[in-house]
């Protein structure tokens, strides 16, 4: 807008009305300063702000204001009014009420001019109340001056705000006022009072000053800066507006909210609403079906129909087989031909059943819950019955017809090609390695040789060249079987297609039946194995398909397995090196031939079967001659052998501590059960040679004070006199070293393990043991005979030991007291024994006088014993027992 220098008076109100548009709807307030009404030093060119007005009238009026320099105040006010409305509509906001701004100027202006100016400013001031916190930028605001203005004009603003109570509706409707048109702003300005006109007139002058003061610096600023001024000038009147808003905020809430929002947190909850909510709480719960007790207790759910059970199980098992897998594109799923034919039949049956079920749904709505009306079970039943009646598990003809109808586009994928290549291995050696089982016609568009590269087999077994390597013998045998294989393959391929890819693991048979593929010398066996695999694979597929040829196929399978085992046994005999395998597999041999073979292969056995042990028997066959290697190792045989003595009648239990080494027995005990052969020459034993120079104390193994169990001294002396080469292993300490033969070297471990059977001269033990082994007299000899003997023997050793220790104590006591006071321990023992005997005799005399008979078992009454003798007088054995007591 352009202004002339001579027209200060006419342009005064135009500048006042324009200033809110540049200062954000509020004039900048200064304290104690008045700006002279001079010519603005810089004009505002609105073309540089790139303002897009709502209508073309704003641009026309801007051009009129630039070119028009007349003194018509009304025209200037109207054009600026339209211009301000256009700016505010672009910003989406309204400036705050001009009456909220305090003023320091008391300029005298005409009332007509005030009314005209108020029309443009009162509409702007009415909507300025909605300018709360719409911007976040405070970089262009001088807060120090704002606080000074707020403190100085707080009282005047409070008086000037008395007219705002009549218009609370304008504050609540921010969006409506922000988008209001020019006519609405004019209608609002007409409703204002005369007092508001005076107040609005006073507010225009500080806008002019602030425009002159601050507008020079920001004349080139874009519209977003103006938005920031709109925002932060609202903070001046926060304190005053807070009290006014509290008074009239509830009025629009009562009108707007009213009946719709009764449960708002501002309104207290009525006591009548609480029981209503509790009453309706049960209705909002999830509806749980109520089941009668009769239905729970009934046994109908547990009654299972066999036909329905079979149909359900068949449906569950065949769900994955009959349903085609999800494939990408238009390619059909890779399935066997029988499966695809069955799925086509099933889909046809499903469509028929669905149409029938749709037609009958209207009549059978009440019976849908019953198992009889289950459409899925009906479909399965119908399908199974039709299949059993028509096909009877035999789908050979249908599968052969359908092989030409179905093509497998998905077979070109890498995984499927590899899997199918495994299936074709070894079926027919005259054809390529990879061939799809479902394509009987053989008319495939792809090159089958490409699949050979995918499978890295090191075996030259399946090449066609191998058929010409071994001469006419192999070729004639091969030709005889290829014709048979071709016939079987055509018949059995359709049945094998019934199995899914997951169940068909027949390609793994090649690994189990061709274990000797690495050696090139066994190609004959490999070919036989491959033929066996071909037949066994087909027989296995026949079993799975449950065809009529299953029984004959099983017989062929077992026959081929037996033939294959014979081939394997021969192949093992070639590279094992042991003639035993060949001997048992080829032909029966005589014992002489077998011995000759064993002698010839003794060296090979040492190399190959050195660590071999059958672990099935502990006996050695003595009919076979011993090898030279075994003859050199007599005492270190690796096999444990058990040798039993023939003298079972004279066997006696060995006594502990009486083990004596002997030279007459070549066997020693290892663990009480098994025995091993000892060396005949003791000088070869390294232990005995190393210990030959040791003293005789090593011959006494257990000689601590003679406390261990050992032979009596008499038996030891007699045994040493009888056999001077015997050495005592366990014995008392008083055996002199001269009794041990000096020519006998130290005992070896083998000698300590020898068992002495009949060396003991105690004839009593021999007699007792023989009587014990005798079945006739076994009952009469109790086991206490051995126990009593051992007790008496141990008693004798214990008494000797006590006497020995007593003698040592007495000798020590003599040395200690030097003969002054001799302590005799035997006298009180004799006195105690004499006193016991005397008391016993006195008690016996007293018992006899009272009528009792003393026996070994105690005192018995004479009358009782007399009654027993009268009653049992005829039984002599019992009487002897009683009298012996």
From Swiss-Prot:
Similarity field: Belongs to the IFH1 family.
Quaternary structure note: Interacts with FLH1 and TBF1.
A cellular component term from Gene Ontology for this protein is: nucleus
Where is the segment annotated Disordered?
1-138, 150-201, 234-275, 291-410, 465-639, 680-708, 813-835
Acidic residues biased stretches = 55-78, 102-112, 125-138, 185-198, 252-263, 294-308, 344-354, 362-374, 392-404, 603-622
Q: According to the UniProt entry, which residue ranges have a biased composition of type Low complexity?
A: 173-184, 626-638
Compositional bias ranges of the Basic residues kind: 26-40, 153-167, 534-544
Q: Name one GO biological process term.
A: regulation of transcription by RNA polymerase II
Function field: Transcriptional coactivator that together with FHL1 regulates the expression of rRNA and ribosomal protein genes. The FHL1-IFH1 complex is targeted to the ribosomal protein genes by the DNA-binding factor TBF1.
- Transcription keyword on record: yes
Q: What induces it?
A: Induced during biofilm formation.
InterPro entries linked to this entry: TF_CRF1/IFH1 (IPR018837)
Compositionally biased spans, kind Basic and acidic residues = 375-384
Q: What is this protein called?
A: Transcriptional regulator IFH1
- Where does this protein have compositionally biased stretches of type Polar residues? 1-22, 115-124, 328-343, 689-708
* Keywords assigned: Nucleus, Transcription, Transcription regulation
User: Which gene is transcribed and translated to give this protein?
Assistant: IFH1
Q: Which Pfam families match?
A: CRF1
Where found?
A: Nucleus
**What's one GO MF term for it?**
transcription cis-regulatory region binding
Q: Does the keyword Ribonucleoprotein apply?
A: no
């Amino acid at each position: 807008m352009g202004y002339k220098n001579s027209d200060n008076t006419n342009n005064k109100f135009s500048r006042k009305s324009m200033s809110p548009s540049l200062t954000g709807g509020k004039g900048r307030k200064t304290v104690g300063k008045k700006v002279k009404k001079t010519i603005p030093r810089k004009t505002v060119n609105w073309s540089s702000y790139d303002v897009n007005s709502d209508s073309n009238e704003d641009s026309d009026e801007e051009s009129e204001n630039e070119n028009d320099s007349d003194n018509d105040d009304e025209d200037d006010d109207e054009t600026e009014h339209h211009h301000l409305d256009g700016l505010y509509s672009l910003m989406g906001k309204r400036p705050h009420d001009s009456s909220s701004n305090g003023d320091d100027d008391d300029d005298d202006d005409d009332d007509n001019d005030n009314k005209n100016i108020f029309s443009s400013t009162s509409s702007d001031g009415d909507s300025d109340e909605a300018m709360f916190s719409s911007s976040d930028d405070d970089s262009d605001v001088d807060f120090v001056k704002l606080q000074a203005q707020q403190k100085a004009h707080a009282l005047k603003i409070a008086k000037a705000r008395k007219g705002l109570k009549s218009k609370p509706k304008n504050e609540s409707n921010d969006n409506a006022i922000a988008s209001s048109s020019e006519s609405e702003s004019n209608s609002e300005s007409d409703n204002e009072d005369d007092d508001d006109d005076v107040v609005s007139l006073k507010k225009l002058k500080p806008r002019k000053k602030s425009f002159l003061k601050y507008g020079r610096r920001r004349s080139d600023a874009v519209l977003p800066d103006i938005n920031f001024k709109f925002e932060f000038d609202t903070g001046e009147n926060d304190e005053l507006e807070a009290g006014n808003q509290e008074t009239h905020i509830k009025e629009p809430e009562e009108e707007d909210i009213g009946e719709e929002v009764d449960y708002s947190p501002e309104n207290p909850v009525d006591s009548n609403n609480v029981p209503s909510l509790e009453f309706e709480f049960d209705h909002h719960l999830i509806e749980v079906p109520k089941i009668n007790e009769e239905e729970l207790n009934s046994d109908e759910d547990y009654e299972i129909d066999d036909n329905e059970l079979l149909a359900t199980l068949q449906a569950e098992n065949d769900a994955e087989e009959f349903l085609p897998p999800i494939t990408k594109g238009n390619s059909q799923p890779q399935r066997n031909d029988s499966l695809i034919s069955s799925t086509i039949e099933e889909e046809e049956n499903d469509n028929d059943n669905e149409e029938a079920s749709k037609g009958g749904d209207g009549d059978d709505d009440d019976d849908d819950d019953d198992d009889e009306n289950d459409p899925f079970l009906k479909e399965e039943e119908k399908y199974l019955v039709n299949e059993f009646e028509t096909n009877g598990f035999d789908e050979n003809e249908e599968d052969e017809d359908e092989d030409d109808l179905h093509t497998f586009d998905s077979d070109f994928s890498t995984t499927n090609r590899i899997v199918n290549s495994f299936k074709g291995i070894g079926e027919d050696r005259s054809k390529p390695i990879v061939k799809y089982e479902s394509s009987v016609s053989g008319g495939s568009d792809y090159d089958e040789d490409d699949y050979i590269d995918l499978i890295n087999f090191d075996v030259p077994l399946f090449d066609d060249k191998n058929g010409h390597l071994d001469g006419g013998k192999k070729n004639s045998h091969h030709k005889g079987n290829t014709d048979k294989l071709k016939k079987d393959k055509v018949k059995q391929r359709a049945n094998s297609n019934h199995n899914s890819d997951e169940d068909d693991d027949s390609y793994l048979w090649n690994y189990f039946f061709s274990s000797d593929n690495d050696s090139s010398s066994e190609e004959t066996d490999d070919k036989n194995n491959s033929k066996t695999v071909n037949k066994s694979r087909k027989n296995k597929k026949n079993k799975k398909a449950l065809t009529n040829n299953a029984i004959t196929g099983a017989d062929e399978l077992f026959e081929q397995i037996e033939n294959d085992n014979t081939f394997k046994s021969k192949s093992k005999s070639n590279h094992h090196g042991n003639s035993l395998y060949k001997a048992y597999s080829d032909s029966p041999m005589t014992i002489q031939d077998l011995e000759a073979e064993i002698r010839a292969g003794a060296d090979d056995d040492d190399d190959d079967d050195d660590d071999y042990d059958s672990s099935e028997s502990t006996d050695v066959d003595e009919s076979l001659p011993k090898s030279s290697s075994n003859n050199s190792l007599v005492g270190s045989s690796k096999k444990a052998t058990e040798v039993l003595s023939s003298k079972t009648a004279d066997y006696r239990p060995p006594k502990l501590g009486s083990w004596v080494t002997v030279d007459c027995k070549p066997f020693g005990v290892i663990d009480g059960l098994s025995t091993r052969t000892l060396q005949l020459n003791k000088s070869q034993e390294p232990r005995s040679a190393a210990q030959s120079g040791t003293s005789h104390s090593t011959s006494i193994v257990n000689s601590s004070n003679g406390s261990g169990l050992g032979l009596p001294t008499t038996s030891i002396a007699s045994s040493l006199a009888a056999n001077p080469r015997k050495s005592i292993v366990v014995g008392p300490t008083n055996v002199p070293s001269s009794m041990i033969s000096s020519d006998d070297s130290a005992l070896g471990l083998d000698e300590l393990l020898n068992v002495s059977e009949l060396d003991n001269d105690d004839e009593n033990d021999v007699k007792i043991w023989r009587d014990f082994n005798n079945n006739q007299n076994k009952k009469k000899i109790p086991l206490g005979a051995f126990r009593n003997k051992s007790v008496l023997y141990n008693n004798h050793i214990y008494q000797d030991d006590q006497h020995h220790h007593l003698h040592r104590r007495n000798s020590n006591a003599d040395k200690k007291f030097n003969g002054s006071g001799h302590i005799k321990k035997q006298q009180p023992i004799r006195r105690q024994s004499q006193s016991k005997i005397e008391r016993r005799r006195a008690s016996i005399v007293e018992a006899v006088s009272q009528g009792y008979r003393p026996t070994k078992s105690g005192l018995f009454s004479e009358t009782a014993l007399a009654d027993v003798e009268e009653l049992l007088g005829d039984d002599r054995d019992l009487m002897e027992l009683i009298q012996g007591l």
